[in-house]
Amino acid sequence: MRKTLTVLGSINADHVISVPYFTKPGETLTGQNYQIAYGGKGANQAVAAARLGAKVAFISCIGSDSIGKTMKNAFAQEGIDTTHINTVSQEMTGMAFIQVAKSSENSIVLASGANSHLSEMVVRQSEAQIAQSDCLLMQLETPLSGVELAAQIAKKNGVKVVLNPAPAQILSDELLSLIDIITPNETEAEILTGVEVADEQSAVKAASVFHDKGIETVMITLGAKGVFVSRKGKSRIIKGFCVQAIDTTAAGDTFNGGFVTALLEEKSFDEAIRFGQAAAAISVTKKGAQSSIPTRQETLEFLEHA
């Protein structure tokens, strides 16, 4: 029987435009290839996990608008349990305004909308879903009070808690003590620990700060350099795959969804990381957020030929 992953997080309608470079203050640029795509860190990670083979339930909020309803239907078609996606009346679905530069880097501005309603009250309504899960995966695009309560419910019921602390913000020691696995990138690790992560040595220092807060496993994603892992007194960098990137928008989300999926299938940590890395590597070779997330079959074939 497949284990259950519950994802708690955001849903955004992504307004994406390609630009030659990011604008400077006071500058106007003409962009190209404008499109509206489905995104939000929570949604991206839920879709990634579902596409890659996980049994996923998604706790989230949408607005009382047509894009929210359309997105909820799309998640159901991905095989995601949408029972816990709440519709907030007289509110818009969250939005993200994304610039993608020629370098393939992206710059994102968020309008929270319905995401700001993912409160303790909404989480409490989904308590039974969290309690019966095998793993809870969260990010930080929704209110911290809801994230903290979900982590408390999970911990009380022996559910593994994975936090992708993005976008980065200072977190309480109480919340950090409830996390089993944390997956920041270099910037997020620095904001949370005060240690600038530039190499393996500094990553070890940052990881020790997380370990001191009670987090057993620290995984710092290093972009093209791979993933730094620290657990059970040992640390190492697991190198990524070399691909021609054209859009990195959902790379981190795809990695998190893939990693947790493989972990729930009883894969070793290294195997789970490689699976997540392979899925993320494929995603950066395509444009868009959820549209770039590969299927399980694509990912397995990529690993076979890597």
Curated annotation (Swiss-Prot):
Alphabetical UniProt keywords: ATP-binding, Carbohydrate metabolism, Cytoplasm, Kinase, Magnesium, Metal-binding, Nucleotide-binding, Potassium, Transferase
UniProt-annotated binding residues for ATP: 185, 221-226, 252-253
Positions of K(+) binding: 247, 249, 283, 286, 288, 292
Pathway: Carbohydrate metabolism; D-ribose degradation; D-ribose 5-phosphate from beta-D-ribopyranose: step 2/2
Organism: Haemophilus influenzae (strain ATCC 51907 / DSM 11121 / KW20 / Rd)
Ribonucleoprotein listed as a keyword: no
Top-rank lineage group of the source organism: Bacteria
Family per record: Belongs to the carbohydrate kinase PfkB family. Ribokinase subfamily.
GO function term, MF aspect, one: ATP binding
Any single Gene Ontology cellular-component annotation: cytosol
Residues forming the catalytic site: 253 (proton acceptor)
Positions annotated to bind substrate: 12-14, 40-44, 141, 253
UniProt activity-regulation remark: Activated by a monovalent cation that binds near, but not in, the active site. The most likely occupant of the site in vivo is potassium. Ion binding induces a conformational change that may alter substrate affinity.
Species classification: Bacteria, Pseudomonadati, Pseudomonadota, Gammaproteobacteria, Pasteurellales
UniProt-listed Pfam families: PfkB (PF00294)
Protein name: Ribokinase
Described function: Catalyzes the phosphorylation of ribose at O-5 in a reaction requiring ATP and magnesium. The resulting D-ribose-5-phosphate can then be used either for sythesis of nucleotides, histidine, and tryptophan, or as a component of the pentose phosphate pathway.
Coiled-coil regions listed in the entry: none
NCBIfam families reported for this sequence: D_ribokin_bact, PRK11142.1
Keyword Kinase: yes
